[in-house]
Amino acid sequence: MSNEFEDDYGYDWQPPSDDEGRGFDDGFPFEGNEGADRWADEEDEPAKPAEKYDHHELLEQRVTVHCPVAERCGGCEWLAMPYDMQLERKQDYIEELFADYPVEVEPLMCMIDPRGYRNKVQLPLAPGKDKNGNPTVRWGIFEKGSHWIVPCKQCMVEDPAARPIIGTVARLMPDYGVTPYSEKTCTGTVRYALVRIAHATDEIMLTLVCNATTLPKAFVDAILSAHPEITTVVLNTNTERTSVILGKEEKVLFGPGYIEDELCGCRFRISSSSFYQTNPIAAEALYELAVEMADLRSSDRIGDAYCGTGTIGIVAAKASGAELIGIERNAEAVKDAEINAQINGIENATFVAADAGSEFARMARRGEELDVVFMDPPRAGSSQAFLANLSRLGPRRVVYISCDPKTQIRDIKHLVHNGYRIKRICPVDMFPHTDHVENVVLLERAPRNQFGHRRNSRKDERGGKR
């Protein structure tokens, strides 16, 4: 596991100061700030991590935020909160959420240095004017709650190599007659610049999202001359009047059209549209934790539900030699998963483009078996049909990875009712300085008695602390 990640509250970090030593509030919901109670939406469920705490205490411990756009951005809601306090709030949230179950929540896994972790940066470009009224290219972030672009040359949670590339794109555009896109008039060329950086290999992909199918070659050459570290450039065409960033058509302008990164000893191909964890340091720790929880055998048959490009399943299959069946609704992601399996020499892997619940139902009807299931559903959680069919298949272990623990606990109640027991709970801080927390739960199938019923499956689970 990377030494940049640790599983306790220790850290050695203070917010960096900029050249002018400026500090800004970040809009965190302290006393008097609008939105202080915005998480109190369900009376009978635990509040999100910051809601219940004394605002005077938070004000006393608040740190100076050295981000010139923190108030206008809103992306890092907790930037003014000391990192160890952020971790404490997230730990408390998970512990309260799972308080009805007799399983101690393990210490939250966290970053030693919670800066520069985002490997994907996508920023809009638009027409602007300088102080003399001359046309310029405006680039930066959308102001919170609007589509007004706020100039921002660096961001403390992004890889520092990304924004200078986007700045160069904006600077060179007028020299080559390349115009920024106007949302008001739907004219102009460049809508977004997207940079993806491979943490382990340092490969860099620049994707230019354009209201056009071509760009001047001299313009692309100038970008590459200024940034020889770029390994591939892709033109993504999006001519629709939409807030969706990427279009469906792409053309490779330089390099292979993708980059490759490494996680847990496996290599993964990343395109402009591929889903790939934006915090690779935390992702590696999370995957190693998930595989450890699964306790796989070489004879096992693994199900990887909502598998995306196959990352978790491939890491597990390579570590154990077990057979892998990955299920993902997005057909393009399935193609990426198949390529990733080939890259890593995983020969006993099959990927299916289907709804996970429907595929599990088909497998159950055919009498197929799964020994271990990894599930990493979207924020909305799993469907009742998926959970019912998962219970029918009856794997001995289920490793449930969630980006929304509130929907995770809802789904887990269904699995517990159908004969599973929670064995381990471990939160992971994938997104420092935000209220988001990832959570990994291991469930095991309760043993059957001689009459075929599961013993104490519900009573045991409901006997926990309150």
Where are these regions (language model features)?
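Rossmann-like S-adenosyl-L-methionine
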Residues: 5-9, 20, 24-27, 31-34, ...
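Extended interfacial segments that mediate partner engagement and assembly in macromolecular machines
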Residues: 57-65, 71-180, 200
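Nucleotide donor/acceptor-binding cores
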Residues: 119, 202-204, 299-300
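Solvent-exposed residues in well-ordered beta-strands and their adjoining turns
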Residues: 124-126, 196, 209-211, 444-446
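Short, acidic/hydrophobic/Gly-rich beta-strand patch recurrent on exposed beta strands
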Residues: 140-143, 207-209, 337
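Internal alpha/beta scaffold segment
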Residues: 148-191, 212-234, 241
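Short, aliphatic-rich beta-strand segments
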Residues: 195, 202-211, 267-271
